[in-house]
C-alpha cells in the first residue's frame, strides 16, 4: 500500500467518541503497510501549536484553521493525514474541506453522549455538567452532527479494526492509497 496522492482523514465527533483510538489504529495499519502517515490529534495540538487558543467560538475557528493548513501541507507531500478533532460546527468542517481541497475525507466518529461520558476517564463531562468547564462540546456548547459525512463510524457498534478496514477501503476506492 503506497500513497497515490495522500489524503486528509478529518475525524469529527464528541470527546470520547473514539476519534483518537481510531486514528491511532489507522495510523498503525498505514505505517505497517509502508504508507507515510501522521496523526494530528486535537488534544496534542492544543498543548503545543495551538496552546495560545481557548475554546471561544473564535478560538475554535482559528484552531481548526491551523489544523487544516498543517494537514494540507502534509497531504501535499504524499502523507495520509489523520486529523482527530472535535470540529463541532458545520462551518468548521466546510472551511477545512475548502483549505484541504481534493483528498479531504470527512469521517463522523459517532457514539451516543452517554457512551462518551462513560468512556471519560478524565472526568471532563462530569466537570462540564457541574459548570467547571466552559464551552464544553456536547454539554454547554452544541455539536452539529455532520449532514453528509463521507463515512460514519459508529464506535459503540463497530470494533476498531472494522472501522479501520472501512477507512482503508474508502481510501483505496478514492485512489488516495493503493490496496
Curated annotation (Swiss-Prot):
> Pfam families, from UniProt?
APS_kinase (PF01583)
Example of a GO MF term: ATP binding
Q: What is its EC number?
A: 2.7.1.25
CDD domains in the record: APSK (cd02027)
Record keywords: ATP-binding, Kinase, Nucleotide-binding, Phosphoprotein, Transferase
Q: Which family does it belong to?
A: Belongs to the APS kinase family.
Q: What does this protein do?
A: Catalyzes the synthesis of activated sulfate.
Kindly provide the name given to this protein in its UniProt entry.
Answer: Adenylyl-sulfate kinase
Give the species: Paraburkholderia xenovorans (strain LB400)
Supply the source organism's classification. Answer: Bacteria, Pseudomonadati, Pseudomonadota, Betaproteobacteria, Burkholderiales
Amino acid at each position: 500500500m503506497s500513497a497515490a496522492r495522500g489524503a486528509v482523514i478529518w475525524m469529527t465527533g464528541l470527546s470520547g467518541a473514539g476519534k483518537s483510538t481510531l486514528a491511532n489504529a489507522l495510523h498503525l495499519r498505514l505505517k505497517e503497510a509502508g504508507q507515510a502517515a501522521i496523526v494530528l490529534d486535537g488534544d496534542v495540538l492544543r498543548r503545543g501549536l495551538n496552546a495560545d487558543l481557548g475554546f471561544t467560538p473564535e478560538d475554535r475557528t482559528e484552531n481548526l484553521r491551523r489544523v487544516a493548513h498543517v494537514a494540507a501541507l502534509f497531504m501535499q507531500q504524499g502523507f495520509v493525514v489523520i486529523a482527530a478533532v472535535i470540529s463541532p460546527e458545520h462551518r468548521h468542517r466546510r472551511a477545512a474541506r475548502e483549505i484541504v481541497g481534493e483528498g479531504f475525507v470527512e469521517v463522523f466518529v459517532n457514539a451516543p453522549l452517554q457512551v462518551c461520558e462513560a468512556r471519560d476517564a478524565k472526568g471532563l463531562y462530569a466537570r462540564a455538567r457541574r459548570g467547571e468547564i466552559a464551552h464544553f462540546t456536547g454539554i454547554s456548547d452544541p455539536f452539529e452532527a455532520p449532514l453528509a459525512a463521507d463515512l460514519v463510524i459508529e464506535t459503540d457498534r463497530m470494533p476498531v479494526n472494522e472501522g479501520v478496514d472501512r477507512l482503508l477501503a474508502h481510501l483505496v476506492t478514492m485512489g488516495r492509497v493503493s490496496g
